[in-house]
Amino acid sequence: MLSCDGTFLLLHTLKSGSKDGIIQFEKLEFDKDVIFMKLENAELKNIERIVAISKAAFDSDIDVGASEPGGPPDYDSIAWHIQMKNEGHLLQAVIDGEIVGGAILFLEKDGEILYIGRIFIDPIHHRKGYGLSLMKMVEAYYSGVKTIKLDTPLWNVRTNAFYTKLGYCEVRRDQEFAYYQKELKSVFEVNGCLAKLS
């Protein structure tokens, strides 16, 4: 949720019986079933940690179809991540003061399209709902865009299923990648704050 003071916080409940992926805007009592994740511009002092998470996350793809450890171009490059930070594309995902992941995002066509270059969560936090929370935060943070686009390798069964679960539709594929997109609903302003129509 984006408050009028610029604070951005998503409360995503994982309690059984709740609707998966629903953003809870009311205050929730803190317990082990609630994720409090903050999405913010990456800080230079955190680049080494972010790169270590990126490397670990993409290297873990060997468990879901990759032929060997590795990732997209520059996934393990400190210099490239610094460049992405300096250009405003690199965000860090933080829970309880700990960086747990990141996202590299690009606005296109005068802010109408968001291209998700990559998202990544530290493998020690896989299967905890952090990736789902990160994607929901990206969608809420960029709620003014009309379309979100991304791509993922065909061999990666984990990410293809994940994006489909989140409502992304495959629009095409080539020999290496599946290309997905999602159309977002309208946004309106209430008391100077953005709110998404449901």
What residue spans do the PLM features occupy?
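A short helix-loop-beta-strand connector motif used in the catalytic cores of GNAT acetyltransferases and
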Residues: 79-92
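Conserved GNAT-fold acetyl-CoA-binding loop/helix
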Residues: 55-80
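Conserved GNAT acetyl-CoA-binding A-motif
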Residues: 135, 142-154
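A short beta-loop-alpha structural element at the N-terminal edge
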Residues: 37-52
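Conserved beta-strand-loop-alpha-helix junction that forms the acyl-donor binding cleft
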Residues: 126, 149-160, 176-177
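Conserved active-site alpha-helix within GNAT-family acetyltransferase domains
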Residues: 132-133, 154-173
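Conserved acetyl-CoA pyrophosphate-binding loop and the N-cap/start of the following alpha-helix
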Residues: 125, 129-137
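Conserved beta-strand in the GNAT
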Residues: 92, 98-107, 115, 120
